[in-house]
Curated annotation (Swiss-Prot):
One of its GO terms (cellular component) is plasma membrane. It is an enzyme of class 2 (transferase). It comes from Streptococcus suis (strain 05ZYH33). This is Phospho-N-acetylmuramoyl-pentapeptide-transferase. Its cofactor is Mg(2+). GO terms for molecular function: metal ion binding; phospho-N-acetylmuramoyl-pentapeptide-transferase activity. Pfam families: Glycos_transf_4 (PF00953), MraY_sig1 (PF10555). Keywords: Cell cycle, Cell division, Cell membrane, Cell shape, Cell wall biogenesis/degradation, Magnesium, Membrane, Metal-binding, Peptidoglycan synthesis, Transferase, Transmembrane, Transmembrane helix. HAMAP family: MraY. It is a multi-pass membrane protein. The gene is mraY. Pathway: Cell wall biogenesis; peptidoglycan biosynthesis. NCBIfam families: mraY (TIGR00445). InterPro entries: Glycosyl_transferase_4, PNAcMuramoyl-5peptid_Trfase, PNAcMuramoyl-5peptid_Trfase_CS. It catalyses: UDP-N-acetyl-alpha-D-muramoyl-L-alanyl-gamma-D-glutamyl-L-lysyl-D-alanyl-D-alanine + di-trans,octa-cis-undecaprenyl phosphate = Mur2Ac(oyl-L-Ala-gamma-D-Glu-L-Lys-D-Ala-D-Ala)-di-trans,octa-cis-undecaprenyl diphosphate + UMP.
Length: 332
């Protein structure tokens, strides 16, 4: 356990030291910062804030994990698989951010390009790690269900789905970074109890990196992680749940990401249905993803506006409670 804490501390200190230099470089080169969607009026003042900060904590977490895993003879296939997805999905996010900021392409990678690259990463992960490790059984609330060839599309769905879910969650200061810290703390406990010390190392290292990033990402944020960070973190969580053979746990531990994604899907579907049925589109939520609904009118959407901190603490609490419930189901 000490090696993991040391690794996390190194990642924390490195990120805390490097982020200000990244911000200084960003501003010195007069790079255009974060663009704000015109519909999110309450966040327009944040336009121009440096973004792509995920580049820093990703590089730090990957290098520190490799260093400590090698030093403590924990450089396993599981570690390499997690770091592979972290790096590849980070590259996908980096390309998306790069096109938006440097090439002035508003949508970055189009949805088909992004999906194709995410699926490619999932295919490599499956055939190199999952299939090689004899995967094919899905853990459903503690019961192993043999899926055979169907486990392959499940893996792709899990990786792509949660990668995009965390991306949707990254919409207000500090929300995604601490939500993922809470999720990784839960997986650290699971990895420790299952004696998967290699995966424990990676989890704690990323926790250190994210806490270092949060120093500058908390409200008022001096930097955002960008798609380079959020897409990679979602892919990482999905990979960890698969590597631990505890896939089902991500539905509870990652309930915040599920809520955020579901709110968008419900909103779009209901709007299209009502427009076709009644001639005008209607909405379930004030705005999606769900954190914007909370900002504009609390849980009901009709109450007074919530501050970003209130939204953060509410959704962090949901993540923490669900993580504790998951651990209780597993070990009590």
């Amino acid at each position: 356990m000490q090696f993991a804490l040391m690794s996390g501390l190194v990642a924390f200190l490195a990120t805390v030291l490097l982020i200000p230099r990244f911000i200084t470089f960003y501003q010195a080169k007069r790079i255009e910062g974060q663009q704000m969607h015109e519909d999110v009026k309450q966040h327009q003042f944040k336009a121009g804030t440096p973004t792509m900060g995920g580049t820093v904590f990703l590089v730090v977490a990957i290098l520190v994990s490799l260093l400590f895993a090698t030093a403590f003879q924990l450089l396993t296939g599981g570690v390499l698989a997690i770091l592979f997805i972290l790096a590849l999905y980070g590259v996908v996010g980096f390309l998306d951010d790069f096109l938006k900021i440097f090439r002035k392409i508003n949508e970055g990678l189009n949805p088909k390009q992004k999906l194709a690259l995410q699926i490619l990463g999932g295919i490599v992960f499956y055939f190199v790690h999952v299939r090689g490790a004899g995967g094919g059984e899905l853990n459903v609330f503690g019961h192993m269900v043999h899926l055979g060839v169907l486990y392959f599309p499940f893996v792709l769905f899990w990786l792509v789905g949660f990668s995009n879910a965390v991306n949707l969650t990254d919409g207000i200061d500090g929300l995604a970074s601490i939500s993922v810290v809470i999720s990784l703390l839960a997986y650290s406990v699971i990895a420790f109890n299952e004696q998967k010390f290699d995966i424990l190392l990676v989890c704690v290292t990323m926790i250190g990196g994210l806490l270092g990033f949060f120093v500058y990402n908390r409200k008022p944020a001096k930097i955002f992680m960008g798609d380079v960070g959020s897409l990679a973190l979602g892919g990482m969580l999905a990979t960890i749940s698969i590597a631990l053979r505890q896939e089902w746990t991500l539905l509870l531990i990652g309930l915040v990401y599920v809520i955020e994604t579901s709110s968008v899907m419900l909103q779009v579907s209901y709007f299209k249905y009502t427009k076709k049925r009644f001639g005008e589109g209607r909405r379930i939520f004030r705005m999606t993803p769900f954190h914007h609904h909370l900002e504009l009118g609390g849980l009901t959407g009709k109450a007074e506006k919530w501050s970003e901190w209130k939204v953060d603490f509410f959704l962090w609490s949901v993540g923490l409670i669900m993580s504790l419930i998951t651990l209780a189901i597993l070990y009590l």
